[in-house]
Amino acid sequence: QAPPKRQDEKPVQHHSAAISLGLVLTACKEIGLYTDGQIRSWRDLCATASFVRGMLGISADTWKEAEADMGEETAAIAIACILERTETIRSPGGYLRALAQKARAGSFSPGPMVMAILNAREPVAA
C-alpha cells in the first residue's frame, strides 16, 4: 500500500490544469543534480530551485518577484524548465521576468512548458 500523500505533494493547480511533481521531475531531470538527496516534495523542489536560480544568474529580486506573481511552486517549475533549456535561453533572468509578467496578467501556466520539454525528448515516429 502506498503511503498517503503529504499536503505539499498535491499537484499545482493553474487554469484548471493540474501538473504533478512527478511529471515536472520526469521532464526536468537536470534540477535533480543540484540536490544532496532526492526531490520528494514541492518543498524540496522549491528549495532546490531557490539554490539553482543563483547559478543561472537570476537575481534575488527577480526570484522574489516571480514567487509573488506566480506562486512559489510555479516559480520553481519555471526554474526547473529554464535549467533544462539553458542552451537556448540567453537571459534566464529576463525570461523568468517575462513569465512572471504573464502570470501577473493571468496568462501563464507551467503545463505547456513542461510538456514542451517532454515532447522534445520523444522520438519522432517515422
Which sequence ranges carry the predicted segments?
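Electrostatic interaction modules used in gene-expression and signaling proteins
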Residues: 1-126
